[in-house]
Amino acid sequence: MAVGTTPGELRELTDDELKDKLRESKEELFNLRFQMATGQLSNNRRLRTVRQEIARVYTVLRERELGLASGPAGEES
């Protein structure tokens, strides 16, 4: 099974939790890129999965901004 967070799991998080997840993912991507540049990265696939996770978080945040989806448990953001 894929490592990471599914869109359904992300939609259950609050906006603040999503922003924290986004920050953590961006930090991880930075570290992975640094490891790649120094030749220490053993799992190149992780770069792609982290980028996809960042895109998923941005998508959920944008859906809420446009009113296409509500926050967790039907709360409006």
Swiss-Prot record:
Asked if the Swiss-Prot or TrEMBL record annotates the protein with the keyword Ligase, the reply is: no
Record GO terms (molecular function)? structural constituent of ribosome
Q: Which InterPro entries match?
A: Ribosomal_protein_uL29, Ribosomal_uL29, Ribosomal_uL29_CS, Ribosomal_uL29_sf
**Disulfide bonds, which pairs?**
none
- A Pfam family recorded for this sequence: Ribosomal_L29
Q: Which UniProt keywords apply?
A: Ribonucleoprotein, Ribosomal protein
Q: Which residues form a coiled coil?
A: none
Tell me which SUPFAM superfamilies the record gives: Ribosomal protein L29 (L29p)
Its BP terms in the Gene Ontology are:
translation
Q: Name one GO cellular component term.
A: cytosolic large ribosomal subunit
Please state which protein family the record places this protein in: Belongs to the universal ribosomal protein uL29 family.
What the entry lists under NCBIfam families is as follows: L29
- The entry's protein name is Large ribosomal subunit protein uL29
Organism of provenance: Mycolicibacterium smegmatis (strain ATCC 700084 / mc(2)155)
